[in-house]
Structures are given as C-alpha cells and as structure tokens.
C-alpha cells in the first residue's frame, strides 16, 4: 500500500520533459553515428542552431557506398545457403529495398541537405517562440506521453544490436557490419519521421493548451472590459498581440509540417514497405524452419513497435491540428472592436484549411486504423504460415 502512495510522488519529482529531451538527444547521436544525420546542433547567442558538416558528410558518403556495395556483393554468398526460392526471393527484395533506401538517404543528404537544415532550424525556432509565448522552462520536450514514446523508441533502437549474432569469421563480421549499417540506415527514415511528427504534435498541443487556457481568458476579458477600454487599454492590446502570435505560430506549424511531408513522403512509404517485407520474411523463416529464437521474433516485434510508434506520433500531430477548429469557435466572443473581429475572422478562416493528414504517395493514410489493419494482416499471415507448415509435415 505504501508503494502505491510513493509511486505518484516519484512521477511528480521525475522531470519527464527533461528526460525526453535527453532521449531525443541520444536518438540524434544514434543517427549521427550511422551516418544518416550529418549536421550538428550548436548554441549561438543562447539559441540552438543546426549547422551542416561538409567533411563528415563526405565521410558518410564513402562509408555508405562501400557498405552498400559490399552488402550487395555478398548477397549470393549468404543467400545461397537457403534452398527455398521463396525465402531467397524475400532476401532479394530486402536487398533491393535497403539499397534503394540507401540511395534515397544519399540524395536527401546531398541534393536536399540545405532544405533539411532549414527545416530543422524552423523547428528549433518554433520551439523557441513557443517557449517565449507560454513561458515554459528550457531543455524540455513534451510530457509523459512523449516520454513513454521516446523511451520505447530508444529501446527499439538498442534492440537491433541484440538481433545479430557475432561470429569470429572475418568475412562474416564484415558482412554483418555492412548489413547492420545499411539496414539501420533504412530504419532511420522511420525514426526521423517519428521524431518529426512527434515534434509537430508537441507544438500543436502546447499551443492549443495556451489558446484553451490563457488566451481564452484574455479574450473573454475583452467583453467585460469593453466598456472600460478607454480607461485601461493595456489588457486589450496584450490580448490582440497574443492572438497575433498564435496566428503566426499556427500558420508556421502548418507550413513546417507541409515541408516535412514533402521531403519525407517517398522515403516514409519505402521504409514502411521495407518493414512489412522484413516482418513477413522473418516470420516465414522462423515458422517454416521452426526457429523460434528470441532474436528472430524479437526483430519482428521491434519492427512492429516501430510502425506502432510512428502511427501514434502521427495520431498526436493530426489530433492537434483537428483540435484547432473547436478551440477557434470557443474563443469567438462578440465585442465592438472591428480590428478584433478581423483578426478572429482571419483566425477562423485559416485554421479551417490547415488540418494535417499523412498520405504517403497518396496511397494510404497513416493512422491508428492503419495499425489495426497492419496487426490483422500479420495475424492472418502468421496463421497461414502455421497451417502451411503443418500441412507440409503431413505430406
């Protein structure tokens, strides 16, 4: 009983926002180590700024090209041990998917490197403006929900090292390192999309909370203070100024989310397809060959967790954009101020057309329904494999 009473105190004392920021930093270092993130974050004039590193970019280019070439060259060596053509076809599709994602990473780093740097700086600027508007503490990211998602993501990133078995053969070690470097780079696309949409969701939630609590109280005061406006004009000016700031932030979040979607639309689709293919391949290999090892099924669970975390981050961002409509109508108060009405009409008109929806290549919507469809498809596929394996043994 005493433990149940102590647990809430521990959660209150635990600054989950700061821990989430530390976990986000660890994910950044993880992506930097595997050559996907080639910029650095520096503090200039008490502000965080993303700066490109051309030297490290070329180093990552050489390493990724060598790893991809050796990974493709060694395909015949390690896939020839399997006689099942279906399984070899799976390995071939995985090879093609990893190489395509590697090419996309190189294209984004070299041809869209400046756009990525500008996008990261716009994210950092939005968080600075949000912190200034809401007077929130520095070095924080989200709340308990974001902490749980970030903790699950870090666990998923670390689990990939447990799925590989080390052997003393130099050829096998070289093949393993190239496979790890290439496959982790492919998965980093999903991780970057997760962090991006989670950041958009945090921005929407913080701004919506500010509009719902503080800005609403300021706008309501316009009704009561409208008659005494001439005697005390400062509250009205402050409310209108904060309304302008909220308008700017909502519009900027929408523009940043659109730029993010345009950059990661195709990579996200290929990464999701690669995850589905990898799960089906590993499940087929484990069930039909009766290799129920922790490494194989743990890898399937890891890939499934990545997809679930991605859909949850997208869901938080989409819900934040949809909540704007209710908040905008709730903050519409009738006054005699014409400028106030013009700003609120602008507020209402813009936000009705800024709902966020994630459609990779326009083929499907990333949502919780996609997760349910994904789970049902996996269960059906696993049942089919079990039945197929049982019938094959009887024959």
Curated annotation (Swiss-Prot):
Coiled coil region boundaries: none
Membrane topology: Multi-pass membrane protein
Function in brief: Probable gustatory receptor which mediates acceptance or avoidance behavior, depending on its substrates.
Protein name from the UniProt record: Putative gustatory receptor 93b
Tissue note: In larvae, is expressed in neurons of the terminal external chemosensory organ and of the dorsal pharyngeal sense organ.
TM annotation in the entry: 19-39, 90-110, 154-174, 184-204, 268-288, 294-314, 370-390
Subcellular location, record wording: Cell membrane
Name of the gene: Gr93b
